[in-house]
């Protein structure tokens, strides 16, 4: 006899996401990625070299952005979890994504535009006060979009392999966003150059007030392209609705049997060891990725003394290698599992760190080193996001808080790390001296190899104590 028909009350197995649904989700963070690439790469350069603000003033605006982002991220995550589908047209995650997108669209162009009403006699502090509110609004919107988009992964994915695929596609579009920004910046600066070749060699390499229009046009291009992809996300992504609690009537018993799954609240996460294990691993991953991205240009320029074209070509090679490796995440995770996949990425990054430490001059081999760094960073970033989704599991109602807490630790750790590195800078002048030539080399070694060792220790803890909830008792009272 064959198996009987399914029980009447049995739930149908969830249908896997279609290709269009996966791609629609993946482009939902494209606007954030475009803005983040321009923010991290060009903000200090724009404020200091183009707008001629002091290094301290430009640094204060960047610090304000990090503080605002760090504070808004967990708060947005907590509020997103509290939302109970009040939006009629979309779910609570997409509603927060829409709010964040609007804030980014309205504020980001003003950050890379001249101060309205400011003149040559306007004091610097007044101009900084002008930019401050736009930066805070932008960082709030960026955090809301990021947390809402990340917390949709456990909601949409029906199995572990779909989680990896969604994070891999998300990272692939992050790479495309970075390539788009760098290519557009090169094109706009090329158009700004002088038709006289000899004059271009002297003038086009120096940024100044004449390049204000370049950055303003670049920010408008970023906003326009990002808005189109955000619209595609909202049109093609459907968030699952949470069942509403039915109102009791006079014919229903007051003491009905309880069948609903107990909720895992944010305060329960704080008592879970796995929450801190995955948090430390995610923080270490972000330190490797962000610090290497921040200091790779300094390393190429001052430690290796390479021409300026390498500042554009090497990051491009890094992102292209990361783009290609991101598509291998699903089959690799399926074959060897999360932990070994992450460890493989760490081995590639440690190989890059050893190469940089042992070789004074890389020459053209720097392209091969860039491939190692880009593919390794993509591997550990995608896998760490998949591990975070594993930690959340079916408890998607508090997933935004988990992602918010992870991002908060990431922002704080990166800010403190950059401050520590800058405080150790050996040159008292802005012009690089002989002492700083080796300084940036060892910064790259520490940012990749040193933090990579710390990430290895975090991974070992997950091998000993796998990702699962240990302290939460579903039968206990909240």
From Swiss-Prot:
Gene Ontology molecular function: cysteine transmembrane transporter activity; symporter activity
UniProt entry tagged with the keyword RNA-binding: no
Modified residues (N-acetylmethionine): 1
Tree of life domain: Eukaryota
Chief location category: membrane
Lumenal side: 48-56, 119-124, 192-216, 308, 360-361, 422-444
Reactions catalysed according to its record: L-cysteine(in) = L-cysteine(out)
Cystine bridges: none
GO cellular component: lysosomal membrane; lysosome; melanosome membrane; plasma membrane
Intracellular or extracellular location(s): Melanosome membrane; Lysosome membrane
Residue intervals annotated with topology Cytoplasmic: 1-26, 78-97, 146-170, 238-286, 330-338, 383-400, 466-478
InterPro entries given in the database record: MFS_2 (IPR039672), MFS_trans_sf (IPR036259)
Pfam families registered for this protein in UniProt: MFS_2
Membrane topology of this protein: Multi-pass membrane protein
Alphabetical UniProt keywords: Acetylation, Amino-acid transport, Lysosome, Melanin biosynthesis, Membrane, Transmembrane, Transmembrane helix, Transport
Membrane-crossing residue ranges in chain numbering: 27-47, 57-77, 98-118, 125-145, 171-191, 217-237, 287-307, 309-329, 339-359, 362-382, 401-421, 445-465
Gene Ontology biological process: carbohydrate transport; cysteine transmembrane transport; melanin biosynthetic process; pigment metabolic process involved in pigmentation; regulation of melanin biosynthetic process
Family membership noted in the UniProt record: Belongs to the major facilitator superfamily.
Job description of the protein: Transporter that mediates the import of cysteine into melanosomes, thereby regulating skin/hair pigmentation. In melanosomes, cysteine import is required both for normal levels of cystine, the oxidized dimer of cysteine, and provide cysteine for the production of the cysteinyldopas used in pheomelanin synthesis, thereby regulating skin/hair pigmentation. Also catalyzes import of cysteine into lysosomes in non-pigmented cells, regulating lysosomal cystine and cysteine storage, which is essnetial for redox homeostasis.
Listed name of the protein: Major facilitator superfamily domain-containing protein 12
Organism: Canis lupus familiaris
Gene transcribed to yield this protein: MFSD12
């Amino acid at each position: 006899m064959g198996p009987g028909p399914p029980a009447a009350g049995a739930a149908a197995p969830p249908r896997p996401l279609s290709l269009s649904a996966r791609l629609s989700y993946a482009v939902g963070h494209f606007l954030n990625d475009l803005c983040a690439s321009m923010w991290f790469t060009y903000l200090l350069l724009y404020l200091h070299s183009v707008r001629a603000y002091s290094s301290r003033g430009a640094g204060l605006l960047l610090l304000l952005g990090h503080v605002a982002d760090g504070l808004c991220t967990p708060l947005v995550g907590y509020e997103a979890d509290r939302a109970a589908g009040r939006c009629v047209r979309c779910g609570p995650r997409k509603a927060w994504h829409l709010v964040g997108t609007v804030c980014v669209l309205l504020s980001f162009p003003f950050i890379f535009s001249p101060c309205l009403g400011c003149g040559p006699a306007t004091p610097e502090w007044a101009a900084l006060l002008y930019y401050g509110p736009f930066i805070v609004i932008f960082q709030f919107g960026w955090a809301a979009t990021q947390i809402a988009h990340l917390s949709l992964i456990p909601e949409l994915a029906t199995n572990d392999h779909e989680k990896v695929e969604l994070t891999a596609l998300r990272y692939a579009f992050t790479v495309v966003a970075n390539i788009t920004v760098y290519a557009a910046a090169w094109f706009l600066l090329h158009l700004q150059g002088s038709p006289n070749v000899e004059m271009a060699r002297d003038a086009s390499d120096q940024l100044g007030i004449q390049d204000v229009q370049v950055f303003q046009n670049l920010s408008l291009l970023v906003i326009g392209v990002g808005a189109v992809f955000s619209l595609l996300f909202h049109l093609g992504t459907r968030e699952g609705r949470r069942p509403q609690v039915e109102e009791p009537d006079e014919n229903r018993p007051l003491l009905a049997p309880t069948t609903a799954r107990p909720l895992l609240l944010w305060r329960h996460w704080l008592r879970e060891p796995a929450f801190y294990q995955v948090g430390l691993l995610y923080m270490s991953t972000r330190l490797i990725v962000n610090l290497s991205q921040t200091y790779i240009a300094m390393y190429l320029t001052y430690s290796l003394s390479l021409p300026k074209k390498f500042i554009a070509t090497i990051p491009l090679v890094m992102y292209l290698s990361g783009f290609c490796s991101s598509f291998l995440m699903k089959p690799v995770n399926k074959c060897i599992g999360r932990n070994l996949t992450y460890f493989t990425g760490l081995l590639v990054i440690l190989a890059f760190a050893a190469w940089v430490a042992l070789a004074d001059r890389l020459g053209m081999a720097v392209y091969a080193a860039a491939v190692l760094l880009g593919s390794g960073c993509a591997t550990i970033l995608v896998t760490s996001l998949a591990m975070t989704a594993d930690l959340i599991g079916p408890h998607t109602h508090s997933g935004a808080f988990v992602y918010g807490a992870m991002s908060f630790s990431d922002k704080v750790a990166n800010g403190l790390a950059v401050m520590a590195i800058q405080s150790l800078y050996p040159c008292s002048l802005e012009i690089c001296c002989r002492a700083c030539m080796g300084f940036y080399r060892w910064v790259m070694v520490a940012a990749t190899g040193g933090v990579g060792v710390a990430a290895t220790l975090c991974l070992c803890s997950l091998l000993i104590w796998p990702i699962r909830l240990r302290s939460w008792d579903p039968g206990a009272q909240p």
